[in-house]
Regions:
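Q-loop/switch helix immediately C-terminal to the Walker
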Residues: 90, 97-111
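Conserved beta-strand-loop-alpha-helix hinge in the C-terminal portion
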Residues: 215-251
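Conserved ABC ATPase signature
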Residues: 135-139, 143
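Catalytic Walker B motif of ABC-type/P-loop ATPase nucleotide-binding domains
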Residues: 160-163
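H-loop/switch region of ABC-family ATPase nucleotide-binding domains
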Residues: 196-197
Length: 525
């Protein structure tokens, strides 16, 4: 079939009349229009607060903007999201995968299997970095940025959005990055939008230069009739001349308008009072989403499911395992020892122990395990998911066509729930072990059978207590998992949001435990 020349000439991105109003009524973008042609590199410059990040969110996080109360209106946004790729600040490499895994994930979801080493070589990196086990944490800033470029290229995206790609790079690496962008655009027929403050990068790559004006809140083309094109292949004198002119234009604009506050519209976005209650329902929506997506992800993407689940199991069970073992034994010993002393004079401790049996384990293990699990294990997973959002790894997943709900939420939810069930069982065993020490101290015979009877073979009048304990373990497991994933996976605009999410989850899950303890006690008693 012969390609349609008209289709090839159509803009990769065509935005007309874009207007974005913040929830407080400030107009951050007004009548923005931009078309990016095939093979073209467009650079967007602007000061802080000019709307560069907001424009990025319109392209990649439109639904999140709507949920946050932004008013986003455009006459036209023509864009094939299947062709749009993102290179976030500092690369946003997936830290739970090695270098090879980052590239393989992109290729799997693009249904384009290939050798990761080839893509590393294409961006000027040592192919040896594709060896299994090479951690992304060991890469320099320049290497990480190049791996991020290789990852998006391997996903076969045709329109690249590079968000401040030169942050943290020295001038030499900025020059290399500019050369890399131009080389890949030419070699693969790509288009690119580069958002930057770096005039060296801007001059090196731009076919056209735009300023997001703090005065008019729209794009204004710089040097429209004069700009000779990307400076990367130009003589140093010409390059230096245009870099100075570009820097002067940007500084002049910032000097005049840098402190300008965004204007407010007379018509604020409509109030949505139900948004206040949205966080309360989020854990239940996460549970429903995870239940729906987990079976499909497990069957179709077994490797990805196992990778994320293994990470969460390590955080929630394997690493804190010694802590749970020690604490449960100490609590088991302390509780039974105190019980043995409450009878007072004339009451033999061993008689009290035989009377209480393992009831203390049945009554206390679910709640104690839950509270400790939330504070230790739940906080670890909450922090990891939060850091994924904060460092834009979650956004990078979605930009590669990887549904972060299926890839992250579903396996994390399953692994967190199963980890709590395992921790609750371990906690019960630890409390029994502590009780065995007390029984040994008082020479209580058949101590194992005595302390485990209420769990393994309870008397008829105590069956309901064992059933209550089993029910609580089950309800705590999935309630905690839902809240941890919901709060960890919520948007994280700044670092403090990660710690707030952790604290909120501890509070919410503790209230969840207390409520179920009280409710079930009333039913059982």
């Amino acid at each position: 079939m012969t390609p349609d020349p008209a289709a090839d000439a159509a803009p990769r991105l065509d935005v007309r009349g874009l207007r974005v109003v913040l929830p407080d009524g400030r107009v951050v973008i007004e009548d923005l229009t931009l078309a990016v042609a095939p093979g073209e590199v467009v650079v967007l410059l602007g000061g802080s607060g000019a709307g560069k990040s907001t424009f990025s969110r319109v392209l990649f996080e439109r639904d999140e903007l709507d949920r946050a109360g932004f008013d986003v209106v455009a006459a036209q946004v023509a864009l094939d999201h299947g062709e749009l790729g993102l290179v976030p600040q500092r690369g946003a490499l997936f830290d739970h995968l090695d270098v090879r895994g980052n590239l393989e994930l992109a290729m799997r979801y693009a249904d384009a299997p290939d050798d990761p080493a080839r893509w590393l070589e294409r961006v000027g990196l040592d192919p040896a970095l594709a060896a299994p086990g090479t951690p992304v944490s060991g890469l320099s800033g320049g290497q990480a940025q190049r791996v991020a470029v290789a990852r998006v290229l391997a996903s076969r995206r045709r329109l690249l959005f590079l968000d401040e790609p030169s942050v943290g790079l020295d001038p030499q690496r900025v020059r290399r990055l500019a050369r890399l962008i131009r080389e890949q655009v030419r070699a693969l027929g790509l288009s690119a939008i580069v958002v930057t403050h770096d005039v060296a990068l801007a001059a090196g790559v731009a076919d056209r230069l735009f300023l997001l004006s703090l005065e008019h809140r729209r794009l204004e083309q710089l040097f429209a009739a004069e700009w000779p094109g990307p400076m990367e292949d130009r003589a140093d004198t010409e390059r230096g001349h245009w870099m100075l002119r570009l820097a002067e234009a940007l500084i002049s604009h910032l000097d005049e308008h840098g402190d300008r506050v965004a204007p407010r519209t007379a018509h604020r976005p409509p109030l949505r009072p139900w948004r206040v209650l949205e966080p309360l329902g989020r854990p239940f929506r996460v549970a429903g989403t995870a239940l729906a997506l987990a079976p499909r992800q497990l069957v179709r993407r077994t490797r990805d499911f196992a990778t994320v689940a293994a990470r969460v199991l390590a955080q929630t069970f394997l690493r804190p395992l010694p802590f749970y073992a020690i604490v449960s034994v100490l609590i088991g010993y302390t509780v039974l020892y105190v019980i043995s002393k409450v009878g007072g004079a004339g009451v033999r401790p061993d008689a009290l122990i035989r009377q209480i049996g393992g009831a203390y384990v049945v009554a206390l293990a679910p709640a104690l395990a839950a509270v400790l699990f939330v504070a230790a294990s739940g906080s670890a997973t909450n922090a990891w998911l939060g850091s994924m959002g904060l460092t834009r790894q979650t956004l990078a997943l979605d930009a590669l066509g990887v549904d972060s709900r299926a890839y992250l939420w579903a396996p994390a939810w399953v692994a967190c729930g199963l980890a709590f069930i395992a921790v609750a069982a371990l906690f019960a065993l630890g409390m029994i072990a502590g009780g065995l020490l007390v029984c040994r101290q008082y020479h209580v015979p058949h101590a194992w059978e005595l302390l485990t009877a209420d769990l393994l073979d309870p008397r008829p009048e105590r069956v309901r207590y064992a059933l209550r304990a089993g029910f609580l373990v089950w309800i705590y497991a999935w309630g905690i998992a839902s809240d941890v994933v919901a709060k960890g996976g919520a948007p994280k605009p700044e670092a403090d949001a990660v710690t707030r999410g952790m604290t909120a989850s501890v509070v919410a899950c503790t209230l969840w435990v207390v409520a179920w303890e009280l409710a079930t006690v009333l039913v059982v008693l």
